[in-house]
Regions:
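N-terminal secretory signal peptides that target proteins for export/translocation
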Residues: 1-9
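Sec/Tat signal peptide C-region and signal peptidase I cleavage site
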Residues: 26-30
Length: 209
């Protein structure tokens, strides 16, 4: 793909809908992307749903390439990523222009938190250069739901250079992000037009750095 974003700043926000749409157009490369093979990403690819229990998974994305988690519909929490038992999930660019997109993922059913990512039991998330667009949770956390059980003294949820756009929590709190009993680090992130039953973003027992 030839679309590159180095820094996701507010001045780029109006351009994002058309940029994301181009990824999913009929003639787009995204329509014929191969599935991701391994976690050292050298070419843009479509990722499958990730379910981690007590293990570590590190993704590295080469310059100008994309990892895309899209169109996943599940009847359990975590539309694209599910973490438990202190699992560790990292997606970072190798340099500056590797990108990740979580788009149009949704969950329903009895357990329906975290439209894109669900993390519990002190699992950790570290992501940078990422767009969360139009993910939907039936409960809490339209894009991300993160819950811990004790203070580890480190950031359990670290999100850098991200855009949260048009995410929805249909019957809960945190249109973009719901966090409880975890430490959070947010840097250079943009939140726009996320919707929830009571609030755009909600936290309880959280420390912001």
């Amino acid at each position: 793909m030839n679309m590159r974003i180095i820094f996701l700043r507010k001045e780029y926000l109006s351009l994002l809908p058309s940029m994301i749409a181009s990824l999913f157009s009929v003639n787009s490369v995204a329509e014929v992307l191969d599935s991701c093979q391994g976690y050292d990403i050298k070419a843009s690819c479509q990722a499958s749903r990730q379910s981690l229990s007590g293990i570590t998974q590190d993704w590295s994305i080469a310059d100008g390439q994309w990892v895309i988690f899209s169109g996943m519909a599940n009847n359990a929490s975590g539309g694209a990523v599910f973490l438990q038992q202190s699992a560790e999930f990292t997606i970072l660019p190798q340099n500056e222009t590797g990108m990740t997109l979580f788009a149009n993922n949704s969950i329903s059913g009895e357990y329906n938190n975290g439209g894109a990512i669900f993390a519990k039991e002190n699992s950790t998330i570290n992501i940078a250069n990422v767009i969360f667009d139009s993910n939907v949770a039936g409960g809490y956390g339209g894009a991300i739901y993160s819950a811990g059980t004790n203070d580890t003294g480190a950031a359990d949820l670290r999100i850098t250079n991200a855009v949260f756009l048009n995410n929805i929590a249909n019957d809960g709190k945190g249109g973009a992000l719901y966090n409880i009993n975890n430490d959070v680090y947010l840097s250079d992130d943009v939140f726009n037009n996320n919707q929830a039953y009571t609030s755009t973003s909600y936290s309880d027992g959280v420390r912001y750095h």
